[in-house]
């Protein structure tokens, strides 16, 4: 009888954890703003439909959620990370290029969108020596972790945010290699860079929806390729990226993402010359119709111009 009771309690608890709930999120946007606002969530990107008032445009979206998940709010080309959780609605007001939050889910989202403190900027990848960049990176990420623990936020969010900060750190680490200075054919990176990158190239399919996960893996693969090949041999670097990706990762979503991103970037920059080895890899691993159509259109345009 005791064992039956324990099983019953576990079933009830599991059902409560998996309970789905529709939650509504509201958005207030200045009438003077002309940039569109998109919500990127679960690999879909939805353009918000605003209704104009006297001084604000208003929009809302209701989502069926069973827990907390990351999403991105795009204002034009600028992304803002948000946290969507069942039973934790919020209202977001856009002011001075920032989202400000009110409601049950405001604490986590206010944390995600605060701008105080030291930041990593793109120019840091090449403006300062790699040794100094690495020190700054560790300093910034450690401070962000301190702030996270001090904020006393939802434990479910904290667990995911620790992962996100790790991917953010890895992406910056790799970007310092990819976009760093090259002097006399040699890259300005610390001797331990290759080993550090090898440690963090690990696949984690459970992190697919965490912002920065797929971007960090892509950047790490690119950085390793630049360290193994001559950094100015773009064709060799790309082949290294593609071969490492298809031989290392089992999540086809991740493989498709990296292959598509790097091949498209290469063709946009250098055209279709010397893609005989590249094209079959793209065809084998990229299957989303919209991605294939965009690639075909780009190749056809380049062939007409050549």
How should these model regions be labeled?
Residues 5-8, 40, 45, 304:
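Intrinsic disorder/low-complexity detector
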Residues 96-306:
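Oxidative protein folding and maturation machinery
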Residues 1-24:
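Bacterial Sec-dependent N-terminal signal peptides
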Residues 3-6, 26-28, 154, 280:
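Generic structural signal for short, flexible, solvent-exposed coil/loop and linker residues
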Residues 8-13, 38, 52, 109, ...:
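N-terminal non-cleavable signal-anchor helices
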Residues 17-157, 164, 172:
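A non-transmembrane, solvent-exposed segment enriched in polar/low-complexity residues
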């Amino acid at each position: 009888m005791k064992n039956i009771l324990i099983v019953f309690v576990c079933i009830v608890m599991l059902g409560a954890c998996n309970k789905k709930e529709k939650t509504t999120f509201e958005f207030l946007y200045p009438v003077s703003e002309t940039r569109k606002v998109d919500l990127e969530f679960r690999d879909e990107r939805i353009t918000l439909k605003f209704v104009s008032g006297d001084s604000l445009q208003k929009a809302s979206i209701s989502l069926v959620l069973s827990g907390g998940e990351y999403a991105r709010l795009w204002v034009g080309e600028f992304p803002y990370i948000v946290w969507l959780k069942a039973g934790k609605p919020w209202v977001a007001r856009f002011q001075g290029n920032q989202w400000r939050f009110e409601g049950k889910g405001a604490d986590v989202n206010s944390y995600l969108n605060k701008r105080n403190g030291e930041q990593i900027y793109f120019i840091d990848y090449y403006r300062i020596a790699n040794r100094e960049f690495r020190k700054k990176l560790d300093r910034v990420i450690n401070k962000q972790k301190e702030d996270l623990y001090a904020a006393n936020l939802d434990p479910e969010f904290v667990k995911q945010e620790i992962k996100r900060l790790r991917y953010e750190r890895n992406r910056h680490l790799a970007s310092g290699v990819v976009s760093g200075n090259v002097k006399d054919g040699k890259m300005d990176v610390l001797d331990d860079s290759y080993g550090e990158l090898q440690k963090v190239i690990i696949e984690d399919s459970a992190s697919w929806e965490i912002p920065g996960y797929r971007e960090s893996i892509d950047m790490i693969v690119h950085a390793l390729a630049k360290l193994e090949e001559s950094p100015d041999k773009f064709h060799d670097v790309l082949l290294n990226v593609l071969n490492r990706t298809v031989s290392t990762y089992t999540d086809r979503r991740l493989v498709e993402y990296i292959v598509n991103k790097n091949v498209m970037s290469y063709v946009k920059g250098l055209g279709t010359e010397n893609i005989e080895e590249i094209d079959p890899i793209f065809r084998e691993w990229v299957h989303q119709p919209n991605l294939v159509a965009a690639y075909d259109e780009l190749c056809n345009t380049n062939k007409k111009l050549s």
